[in-house]
Regions:
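C-terminal accessory regions
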Residues: 99-193
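Conserved helicase motor core of P-loop NTPases
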Residues: 1-115
């Protein structure tokens, strides 16, 4: 079972975001792709910032280049997610920019636009300042909707009283190698999961 395999991790309301970000970092530092799935966009921004901090401490990120739509700071080397389909910008492979595409920030142009490389396609793009300011967020953590269709080596799901069993199922199926549930145990009995 997941419990016997150590894939259900007890946590508290106060520490669950730190715990999930630390687990994400352990995987990332081991050169595994990882993702944290949370209930809300606000939670995703919070956890993504914590994940980003681990990258900064390890020296994996460059200069701050722009602020994201959710208020998070974007640095060279950050993984970001586009949040709106647009025909205004085409990637180098002639595909349009899609909602939930994941990119790595590789540079910034003179006008402040972001140069990005797609996470799974061999494509690059330049995202205009206005698009970044309104439609780009950090991608280390995402909502259940944002996780659908995305697969990583190791998945982490923050389970709170708001998390539905359907959402938990989606979240716990994102990792190829393993999936872990970080369960808040101080405010709700999650025995139904």
């Amino acid at each position: 079972t997941y419990a016997q395999a150590g894939r259900i991790v007890e946590s508290s309301t106060d520490t669950v975001f730190d715990d999930a970000a630390a687990a994400w970092w352990t995987d990332t530092a081991a050169n595994k792709s990882a993702m944290v799935v949370v209930d809300t966009a606000s939670d995703a921004a919070d956890v993504s910032t914590r994940c980003q901090h681990h990258l900064m401490v390890d020296g994996r990120l460059g200069d701050h280049v722009r602020d994201a739509a959710d208020g998070c700071r974007i640095h060279i080397g950050d993984m970001v997610q586009t949040r709106r389909n647009t025909n205004e910008v085409l990637a180098s492979d002639h595909h349009r920019i899609l909602n939930r595409d994941v990119w790595t920030v590789t540079g910034v142009t003179g006008d402040g636009s972001l140069k990005v490389r797609h996470a799974t396609r061999h494509a690059t793009a330049t995202l205009p300042v206005s698009y970044v300011s309104n439609d780009v967020v950090l991608a280390y953590a995402t909502t259940i909707a944002g996780a659908q269709g995305r697969t990583v080596d190791r998945g982490h799901v923050v389970v709170t009283p708001r998390t539905t069993s359907a959402s938990l199922y989606v979240g716990m199926s994102r990792g190829r190698e393993s999936n872990h549930a970080h369960v808040v145990c101080d405010s709700h009995d999650h025995t139904e999961f």
